[in-house]
Amino acid sequence: MTRTPVGRLFPTATGHDLVLTRTFRASAADVWASLTESERTARWFGPWEGDAGPGRTIRVQMAYEEQQPWCDVRVEECEPPRRLSVSMVDGSGNWLLEFALTESAGVTELRFTQQLGSLDGVAEVGAGWEYYLDMLVASRDGTPRPEFDEYHPAMRSYYETLAERA
């Protein structure tokens, strides 16, 4: 299946924001549960453990990555069911991520943002988040999970061009 990338880059004072969106026919509260309840995050990203809350660190398993590593994720800000901001550090660096939900007439838009200090590796990062957000969609609507090779290297040139124009 051919996937169409939707990521965009916006300049910021410290680099760029990578922004991707998905739309759901569901309430913000229901989509929020898919982002914050361990048994539901396990369906598209991985389970988590710990006592979640602003300023606290939880452990998240990246269940769909090679070797299914666990990583520490710090909850920076949490405004249920509208906004979740987290940071995590792994072998690739420091990740600053935000999930923002906006609901209107029973439809919720998820706006995912990753703050990037550099555009190095944006082709891999962008394709990875396209994959994970489509995993979220599949987990919610019961469609088959996508395969990562539908995203990378397939979306590489899109994100490389995006970075060149940024």
Question: Which residues are covered by each model-predicted region?
Answer:
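Beta-strand/loop substructures that line and gate deep hydrophobic ligand-binding cavities in soluble
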Residues: G15-D17, S87-R140
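Short, surface-exposed charged micro-motifs
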Residues: R8-F10, E49, R74, L96-A100
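Hydrophobic pocket/interface hotspot
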Residues: V31, L35, T41, I58-V60, ...
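A short, structured loop/turn motif at beta-sheet edges
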Residues: A28, E76-P81, L101-E109
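A conserved amphipathic terminal alpha-helix motif
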Residues: T2-R3, L116-A166
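Generic recognition of short, well-ordered alpha-helical interface segments
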Residues: A26, G53, W70, E124-A127, ...
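Hydrophobic ligand-binding cavity/cleft-lining segments
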Residues: M1-W48
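Glycine-rich portal/gate segments that line the openings of hydrophobic small-molecule binding cavities
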Residues: T23, A42-M88, A166
